[in-house]
Every structure is written in C-alpha cells, then in structure tokens.
UniProtKB/Swiss-Prot annotation:
Superkingdom of source: Eukaryota
An example Gene Ontology molecular-function term: GTPase activator activity
Species this protein is from: Chaetomium globosum (strain ATCC 6205 / CBS 148.51 / DSM 1962 / NBRC 6347 / NRRL 1970)
GO BP terms in the entry: COPII-coated vesicle cargo loading; intracellular protein transport
Cellular component GO terms held in the UniProt record: COPII vesicle coat; endoplasmic reticulum exit site; endoplasmic reticulum membrane; Golgi membrane
Keyword annotations from UniProtKB, A to Z: Cytoplasm, Cytoplasmic vesicle, Endoplasmic reticulum, ER-Golgi transport, Golgi apparatus, Membrane, Metal-binding, Protein transport, Transport, Zinc
Annotated function: Component of the coat protein complex II (COPII) which promotes the formation of transport vesicles from the endoplasmic reticulum (ER). The coat has two main functions, the physical deformation of the endoplasmic reticulum membrane into vesicles and the selection of cargo molecules.
Chain residues that bind Zn(2+): 63, 67, 86, 89
Binding partners and assembly: The COPII coat is composed of at least 5 proteins: the SEC23/24 complex, the SEC13/31 complex, and the protein SAR1.
Gene: SEC23
Similarity comment: family membership: Belongs to the SEC23/SEC24 family. SEC23 subfamily.
Name of the molecule in the record: Protein transport protein SEC23
Subcellular location field: Cytoplasm; Cytoplasmic vesicle, COPII-coated vesicle membrane; Endoplasmic reticulum membrane; Golgi apparatus membrane
Coiled coil: none
Amino acid sequence: MDYDSMKEQWGEVEDRDGVRLSWNVFPSTRMEASRLVVPIGALYTPLKEKPDTPLLQFEPVTCKQPCRSVLNPFCQVDVRARLWICPFCLSRNPLPPHYKDITAQAIPPELHPSNTTIEYRLSRPAPSPPIFLYVVDTCQEEDSLAALKESLIMSLSLLPENALVGLITYGTMAQVHEIGYTECAKSYVFRGSKEYAAKQVQEMLGLIQPAMRPGMPAHQPGRPMPMGPASRFLLPVTQAEFQLTKALEQLQQDPWPISSDRRNLRCTGVALSVAVGLLETSFQNAGGRIMLFAGGPATEGPGMVVGPELREPIRSHHDIDRDNVKYYKKALKFYDNLAKRTAHNGHTIDIFAGCLDQVGLLEMKGLCNSTGGHMILTDSFTSSMFKQSFIRVFEKDGDDNLLMGFNAVLEVLTTKELKVTGLIGHAVSLNKKSTSVGETECGIGNTCSWKMCGIDPKASYGVYFEIAQGGPSQHQQNQKGMIQFLTYYQHSSGQFHLRVTTIARDLSGPAGDPAIAHSFDQEAAAVLMSRIAVFKAEVDDGPDVLRWVDRMLIRLCSRFADYRKDDPSSFRLEKNFTLYPQFMFHLRRSQFLQVFNNSPDETAFYRHVLDHEDVSNSLVMIQPTLDSYTFDQEGGQPVLLDSSSIQPTHILLLDTFFHILIFHGETVAEWRKAGYQDQEGYENFASLLEQPKEDARDLITDRFPLPRFIVCDHGGSQARFLLSKLNPSTTHTSGAGAYGGVGAQSAQTIFTDDVSLQTFMEHLMKLAVSGTN
C-alpha cells in the first residue's frame, strides 16, 4: 500500500476512533522495539465529536475483576455457549441473560466491527449539577472591568438551567458573595496577606457539614447531595441569576488606595484557595469549574509572584536561569499544592488573563495542567480574543448540552505484548497498578489510569507504550496487539458516560520486518516526540533538550534511511519519513523550546495549548502553514515556509495557530497605500486584498483559543512574527542578496545566525551516514 492511501486510512481511523499512532505495526520483540528510536505512542482524543458514535442506554458488559475490559468487536463470542473471551486477560465470561437471543447474524451494537468506539450512558447519576464559580480580579482599569462584567453576565445565559453558580471577587481582600441572601449585598471577607488552611475557610464560611457531626446519618452515594450550608454561596442559575447579575453590575474597582510607584495589592492565592475550600467541603467529586479572571499579577499573600513596588520587575526567563527569583519557588509550590487538592476533588481551574503584563501563569500553570482547565492569555478583557474565546468554552451539542465533560478519568488496558509507560497531557496519575503497566516511565507513568477532571472534544492525550519483556512466545500469523481506552466522565446532562475505544494492530514478523518502517506515521510521531521534548523542557536545561531532539533524529535517520556508509550524497528517506526531519527543524526553532523573546507566562501558555491539541493542530503550531496570493492564480497556494517565499507582488497568509498574519509584499503595500483598490479598473487588486482576509476568517471560525490577527507590510514592525518563523535560506551571510548577488531583488534577506533547513539537513545526513550517534 502506498503512502498516500495509508495516510488516508490513518485519517479514517482518526475520524472514527480519535487515535493516531506513531507506529501502526507493533514490533514483536523488545529488541526490535528498542531500535525504533521513536517510542510506540498514541495521540488519543477521547471525546472527539463524531455524530455517528452509538450512544447505548445500558450498562457495559465487562470482564471479571481485576481486568474489567469492556466487550468490543475484537472479542471472540461463542453464541451457542453464551460465552465471550476477553482478548486482554483471556478469561471466559458468560454473556448477561438479556443477550440470550443473539446469533451470528443478530449481534449487539458493541460487537459490530465498525463500532470500535462506542459510548454508554451509565445509570449512575452525577452527585450534583455542574458548578461554575467565578473568581474575579477587581484591580483593573474601569473599561476592562466593565467589559469583563458584561461577558460574565452574558455567560449566565449559556449555563445549563440547573447549574450551580457562585462569585468570589478579590483585590486587597478576597470576598465570597453570599448570593443566597436577598435582603442586601452580603459577603464574607478574607485578608489578602494571610494563608488560610482548608479547615479555617470552611469554618469561617460555616460550611462544616452537619453530616460530619456524630450521630448523623452519612450521605448515601447516588442520592443527590443535600443542599447544605454551601447553598448560600452556590445556587442554581435560575434562582441566582437576578442576585448575581446585580452583584456583578455593582462591582467596583478595588477601593484600596495605591500610589503611582506601586502595583495594586492583589491576593490571587487567597481567592483561589478560598474557592477550592468552598467546593471541597460540599462538592467533592462533583463536576465543577473555578474560573479565574486575572487582570494582573498576585502581589501579596500566599502565591505572590512579584512585590508591590513597580521598580521591582516581574521575573524573566533570564532571572529563572540565574536563580535570581525571590518568589518563584514558593509561589510554584503553593499553586502546585492547590492543583493537587483540586484534582483530587475532581474540579477544574480555568485561568483567563487579561493584561499586557505577566500575571504569573508560569507559577499557576499546574492549576490548569493538572485539572484539564483552559489557559487563555489576552492583553485585556476588552479584546475580542478574550470575549470570543470565553464564549467558546460554553459550546453546546445538538441537544443543547455543554460539550465539556466533568470529573473525567482515563484508563488504558493492553494485551500482554504491550505495556503502558505513561501519559503526557493535562491529567494527574491515579497510581493504579495493573498488568498493563510498564517498567519504564515516559511522562506521567507507573499507572494505567489518570484523572483529567475537565475534558472537552478537542482534549488530546499522548499515551506511550513499550513491548513487554518476554514479547509473544512464538510468532503466529496475524497476531495482533490491542489497546482499550476507557473514559468515564460526567456529562452535562447529569449522567455519567463511558466512552470506549478499542484498537488492534498487527505484530511484526521475524526480525527486520519491513512492515514496521512502512507503518510509521511521521505526523503523529512528530507530535508525540514534541510532547516529550516539552515535558523534558519543564525540568531540564534548554540546550540539553535540543541535543536530545537532535540525537533522536540522527538515530532515527541512521536506522531507517538508505545510504552507503560515510557517503552523505547517497542518503535517501522513504516517503513516510521525509517530512519528519523538517518537523524537528521547526520544533527546535519553535517558541516551545526557544524561550528567547517570550515571557515565562507566554512559554507556559504555548506549552499548555500544545499539550491539549490533536495531531493536525499541533503540527500547525510546530510547522506553521504559509499560503501565497498573487494576480495570476486562483486563491491561495501553499508555499514553502521559507524566506524565498517573500515576493514584492505577493500577499502571504501565515497560520501559526496562535497568530494569523497577513503580510503584504513591498509592491502590494505601496499600491494599497496609494489607494488603487478604491479606483475603477483595479477591481482585481481589491479582490486580491480581500481573498486572504476571507481565508483568515475561515481559519478563525472554530479555533480555540481565538488567535491573534495581524495585518502587516514588508518592512513593518509586525512583520517580525513572519520572519521569525521562516526558514532563513537567504540571510545576510548566505551570499544571495548579501552584496547584490543573484536573487537580491526578489527574496527577503533575514538577519539571523540561525542555520537554514538546507544546512541542517546537510549536517544531519553527514552524521546519520557516519554511524556515530
């Protein structure tokens, strides 16, 4: 099968099951696996939207303890004996009594060969409706606060009618608004400079449950939670809308006086720990989101990231490298502990930053990364980037249910040939051991089950595997390795759901089977490797991570390219490997690994989004797409991400996922400034200017978070966004264009010391064929 038809097949599997694998044939021995260089990995999107996924209204048929795999199309079923054999633990299980009428022709939907992904609506109800707790920073400019209040009031109409909603505001103090009290505005105030233990918060808010007192009957699972003391602060939207709208409308800027040489006093840490404490008492393991709207950095109390004096700048990457950071470690520890508590309770924290300065996302990143929350970085709450991204959080399906899931858990089962080594994505380990757990660790390892808390249809997880020590005893024809993904989550309709995806792939034949190399999916592999690189970058030095990326690439090319030893000119890669080196070239230069020119908050934000997206979106982040528009062609044409693509009469459209940029070549910019597009007879020029704008609008429609939209001209300051992404094939040192040589007129000269893709490939070939890694 040629590469294009294989790619098509992988695309169909991704549409059906939400899975892309780095290798689509599994090696049958550990020795063979160790020579693959790129680990066996799956990028899995559990809630991938697919209208035809069957939703079954009954409990799944599961294997006996401790296996608990779910009946699927790969199970052998003995219709006469009413038995099914589990492919994971090989035990025989009786079919339930209501399956007595099945025949080889009439089979239940979960055994149908096309239903490798299926969803069950479980009978277990959610302990309470979904909870939304808004935590709002009042130390903001008047216009920014007004825009935020407007967005929050509007969002109440997007919530399910039974959703519980609450409000905490903070500045110098943190205030919990008692919206259940209707006589007047009433709130509980916490000092911003003091650290409160969970128990103190609960006592001060009067939340200690009566059920905790001796002699009281304990709460029975499965029954709705009694609306105890917490109902003063969290009420169903339908009841609370009037009070909450009034409280939001009356929100004023923080009244604490501030001199011109000081920052506002902001107790973000106290506000968050009060929010976590409020949900922890009454709503443990009930789906809920704490949504933080930060207009600046925390400057007092636990979790402060910078001092209140303006002459003290907020930490940069350089400060962190030199360990010149006063608050960083303490703040990081504080927020990481808060994240652990939140994840343990099954709740999610979203952070919306609306500020030109940094707000401390670097320190707070664990809050989102451990709980499956969103992280949105914008310049202000007045920007459409914030407003539209915020609305998209509440997207709904055809039945008017929120697309987001709550309180989610992912479990992975494997057949005996495979073992799970870990997961990289927004989740925490549940420390569950099973026969599927491997010896080595990649990402969050030593477990086969993870808690994600918040999950949405785009959320994707990198799951990594190894081949078991013994491997298959002896190779039999058509032997397959299998993986089953079980995702339990609270659906916004109020029931728990279980999404089951089961995949099977061939095991390779005797050593040196070419099927393994043919099964390499370079796009999935690039994304899975970039997740490992970013995971490493969080703990290792930048240069060490780049060296690791290079080393792995050289080893992969040495292993799978065709060449004669020590002859770089003989180097050839198969079609399904050719793009991989350039993905790695762009990954090395990307903002995920090169932190120069980005603030620590931006780096945390970019890495957060990369760890959330699927293969195609992640590839756009790693290697942006570039389209060119000119007079003698219809629409945009994809062009190389290269400085030679900049031409005076062309318009370029760059999509980096985070930015969408329209760049006008020198001549086009001059014509536009002269106003030709408004003159008669120049309609084709006017439509040329419009085309990239229309395409940009299409790109923005379903993108989350909303990208920044930039229109710039050749030589303009904003053009740096484009130049930094291009392969510098024409630099001030490359001759072409340096001294008016050939090509000086057309291509843009880029002033950089970065190597070009061509030089990078030459070095790669030389090292790969020399056999020294």
